[in-house]
Design a protein with these regions (language model features):
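Short, polar/charged, low-complexity connector loops/linkers at domain or secondary-structure junctions
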Residues: 1-61
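Flexible loop/turn segments at the boundaries of HEAT repeats in alpha-solenoid HEAT proteins
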Residues: 13-16, 66-67, 104-109
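Conserved hydrophobic register position within alpha-solenoid helical repeats
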Residues: 62-67, 74, 93
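Amphipathic alpha-helical scaffolding segments comprising HEAT/armadillo-like alpha-solenoid repeats
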Residues: 73-79, 105-110
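Long, helix-rich interaction regions
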Residues: 85-130
Length: 130
């Protein structure tokens, strides 16, 4: 799915993906919920690793690739990965996202790692447009 105007929100399999305009994309596979959104101009390495994380046997090496390849605009992808990871992986995602798109003062690391919906929404609103 590619979005050229507005936003599209996909839900399924316990996942929610919000895909913005200006090149936002999201893979969809039968038997899974929507994949993690990304921008079409992201690196091929990031996109391949993300596909493995979403639909295959992806692991720490794939997450490391996504984190290393992420640019500021890829905050979209990293923000979605917060709710799709746990423990140390979520902490790594938070740290990389915070380095690219610092959270507002009202958003704490502890709150985000606990998936506090209010804090996640504040950060989402603060980082747009991507």
């Amino acid at each position: 799915l590619r979005v050229f105007l507005g936003y599209v929100q996909l839900e399924g399999g316990g996942r929610v993906s919000t895909i913005p305009m200006d090149g936002g994309e999201c893979s969809i596979r039968s038997g899974f919920g929507p994949g993690t959104p990304f921008f079409g101009d992201a690196s091929e390495d990031l996109k391949v690793a993300l596909q493995r994380l979403d639909f295959g046997a992806g692991g720490d090496a794939d997450l490391s690739t996504v984190l290393e390849e992420a640019r500021g605009r890829d905050g979209l992808t990293l923000w979605h990965l917060l709710s799709r990871t746990s423990g140390e992986q979520r902490a790594r995602v938070y740290d990389r996202l915070a380095s690219l798109k610092p959270p507002p003062a009202t958003v704490t690391r502890q709150g985000v790692l606990a998936l506090d919906a209010t804090m996640l929404d504040r950060w989402w609103d603060d980082m747009r447009p991507f």
